Amino acid sequence: MKNVKLSNTFFLLLLACLLLFSFKTQQDLAPEQIDWDTHFLANPDRRSPYAALTVTNWHYSYNSKISGNNLHIDFKFTGGVVPDRSWVKSERIANRKISRQLLNHEQGHVNINYLLLREGEQQVRFQRYTISNYKRLIQANANRVSKYYSEMQSRYDVETKH
């Protein structure tokens, strides 16, 4: 009877740990919400016809370990807004309604970048790699996803008449 009780306790503890560590942070669950004061710190490009520019990025890195014929790869993915390269022309957002509309448009770029980060992680992390092809395929998968989302960012500007 004691073993059954111990097994139940162990099972509940294990389940609680799994649930606790399976939750992701808010940052992982949704794109970051931008605002003018925090995310647009660079000096505006006065030659640009645009009122604002949101610069985003995504990076991946990995460490690989080969042991015999076994390949183990640990990936890390990061991305988001680059405030020191993003800018807004403050005189162009003096009107509150225009400011909200423009910030909403720029948020769209952040949302697309978030999709890139999530899709990039899926496309790069969950592939079948071999010792002989992993470096080439990781790079090729990342380049393919980056190109797709770069084109999506451009289409977004065209479609929203930015």
Where do the PLM segments sit?
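Sec/Tat-exported extracytoplasmic proteins
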Residues: 106-107, 111, 120, 124, ...
